[in-house]
Structure formats: structure tokens, C-alpha cells
Amino acid sequence: MKNNLLSEKLIYTGDSLTPTHLHLCTYNATEMQESSGDTFQSVKETLDNERINWLQVHGLKDTETIREICSHFEIDFLVLQDILNANHPTKIEEHDKYIVLILKIFYPNEHKEDDDLDGLLQQQVCIILGNNYVLTFLEKETDFFDEINAALRNDILKIRSRLTDYLLSVLLNSIMANYISTISSIDDALEDLEEELLMITNENDIGIQILSLIHI
């Protein structure tokens, strides 16, 4: 594996072919404006330093667009490389003007076969929290944060009156809910597997041995 600290290249290391698409929500306590596009220039004019700006990036294929975004918000080049590294370990990193979080979210594999054990897929999400902005980078087009978009449009619980740290907490709450749901689905699958193993009556069978070890 090459040392990225010595490289000036920007390479997305994941396997998603999703074209890069941007969605910007700019808001304050009284109003909200949205814009979407495939380039940073197409949404840049909507940015407002007097408001909260939440820029959602879906698809990391266009590394030059990712570079433009990070350059505008003065994000360090090494952080930019981390965003594009789909296999980056989970981390929270504090910088002078912003905080970086790299996490994973999980979702069902809709194309798996009945005997396929790989029932869960994952994708990386990177969140950058600044003074008046939040940036979220996802590998694929997804509705994962749609509930938060709807809450902003309808100003649920006066969410638009809050600062960026509150938006971050809402984003993290959605991710934590995803973890809980994922763990629950794994527990259900393990219970189903245990029931199948209990139907085996041969005491010498490997299934019985596994169960005995589980319940020691």
C-alpha cells in the first residue's frame, strides 16, 4: 500500500460508479433555499455566509469537483484524500477551523441470493463540521438523510433556528439508528440460524457443537 502522505494524486478507491451530484440547503430561522447540480459552480452562488449551509455530496467519482469543494472551504489536502479513501477506518479528527468524522453506514443487499451470507452492504460517509457549514460526502446516491431534509423544509422543532452543531447531532443520530437497526437484523439472523441448528438431532453434528460453545 502506497503512503498517501507522499502523493499528490486524488483517486477514489471505492467501487461505486455513481456520478457526483450535489444538493445544497442554505437556511436561517425564517427561510430556506435549496439548489442541486453536478458541479460545484452550479450550487456555489446559493452559499451564504450569513446562514447555515449544508452541502450534500453523493458520488465521489468526480475527484475534481471534490477538490473544488474542499478548496472553497479550506479543507486540508490530506482530509480530501481521506474522503476519497473508501476503506478509511472510522475516525474523528479536530482541525483549527473544522472537525472531520469518517463513519460507515449499512444497508441490505437487495440482490443477494437466499444462500448468500453477504446480506449487508456498507458505504462510507464523511462529515465535516465548520462554523457555518456542514459537508456530507456519500459514495452513492441515497435517501439516507431525506428525513433531515424534510425536517429542514418544514422547520420541525425549529431546527432551522439551531447552529451547525445541532445539525451534526441530528446526522449522527440517524447514523446511530442505522447501527441499531443493523445489529437488530444480525441478531434476528443469528436467532434463525440457531433455530435451524436446534433441529439437528445428531449430537456429533458440528451444529450441536457450535451451540454448546455459544451457550458456555
How would you label these PLM feature ranges?
Residues 1-214:
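Peripheral, non-transmembrane regulatory/ligand-interaction domains of membrane transport proteins
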